[in-house]
Design a protein with these regions (language model features):
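Residues in the helix-turn-helix
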Residues: 19, 30, 44
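Helix-turn-helix/homeodomain-like alpha-helical modules used for DNA recognition
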Residues: 57-75
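N-terminal acidic leader/helix
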Residues: 1-4
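DNA major-groove recognition helix of helix-turn-helix/homeodomain DNA-binding modules
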Residues: 25, 42-60
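Short basic helix-loop element that most often maps to the first helix and adjoining turn
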Residues: 6-19
Length: 75
């Protein structure tokens, strides 16, 4: 997950920094650091990704078409 994907995912879910921090169990400063492009420890990044994925976010790799996110269909 890139900083841009993090911001895109938050926007798609209508989450603020505080919402994401709460869902991931990290500080708001950690989210701010991620979105600034600062390196985070892998376990911390994993927790943030897992919070997004639990909310239905799918991360789209660049694959020549550009990075992105989408919200998975709920069955």
């Amino acid at each position: 997950m890139t900083p841009v994907q993090c911001r895109m995912a938050r926007a798609a879910l209508d989450w603020g920094v505080l919402d994401l921090a709460r869902e991931a169990g990290v500080s708001t400063q950690t989210i701010v650091r991620l979105e600034r492009g600062e390196a985070l420890k892998q376990p911390t990044l994993d927790r943030i990704c897992e919070a997004f994925e639990a909310a239905g976010v799918e991360f789209i790799a660049e694959n020549g078409g550009g990075l992105g996110v989408r919200i998975a269909k709920r069955s």
